A protein has these predicted regions:
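Alpha-helical cap/lid subdomain in secreted, periplasmic
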Residues: 1-189
């Protein structure tokens, strides 16, 4: 039973293809089949745990191409294109709408300029398709450059780290931005 809960989710729901649903799914407690319905389950559970607790919602961050360092076959494109007909930004909008409806504080990381897609990594190191020589591509230049997890080097060397270290997960610098926003709200509670 905590005094403050933070709810920071959405990117895995989007990538996994969970249907966004509609705000009516949230209002009518529509169940776990949609993102909106699932969010209602979470909010209701937190309120049952402690009706007096403060709840802070956090939207997902934007993301560029993710590549897992321990298994490069685990990789995914960024939020710059649809996944199963949905954009990650729609999930951020849903969280903002829920926060407004419930009068909850929302940390909108998706629309935080310091966490924009151009600032997530300095570059992605890939083979130039014409020459086969590795080259550092800044966003959005790397979007259509192929990456082969079987033969290519890891595309995010230490020097490429910016707000994320792998295109998705926050680096120390990225967590600093998130922490600043969270502390600002916590001080006002």
């Amino acid at each position: 039973k905590a005094d403050v809960y933070t709810v920071f989710l959405g990117t895995n729901d989007w990538w996994g293809g969970r249907p966004l649903g509609t705000f009516a799914d949230y209002e009518n407690n529509g169940g776990y089949q949609t993102f909106y319905g699932s969010f209602r389950i979470i909010i209701d559970k937190l309120r049952r745990l402690n009706p007096d607790a403060k709840i802070i919602l956090m939207t997902p961050m934007q993301r560029v191409d993710f590549v897992y360092i321990a298994n490069m076959k685990n990789n995914a494109y960024g939020s710059y294109k649809e996944k199963k007909g949905q954009m990650l930004g729609q999930f951020a909008e849903a969280i903002n709408a829920i926060g407004k409806h419930e009068k909850l504080k929302v940390i909108d990381l998706y629309n935080t300029k310091r966490l924009s897609v151009k600032k997530l990594v300095k570059y992605k190191r890939l083979k130039d398709p014409q020459t086969g020589v590795y080259k550092n591509y800044a966003y959005p230049d790397f979007i259509d450059v192929p990456f082969n997890p079987e033969t290519d080097e890891y595309p995010y060397p230490v020097e490429s780290i910016a707000m994320t270290y792998d295109g998705l997960h926050p680096s120390d610098e990225g967590y600093e931005v998130i922490t600043e926003k969270l502390v600002k709200i916590l001080k006002k509670l």
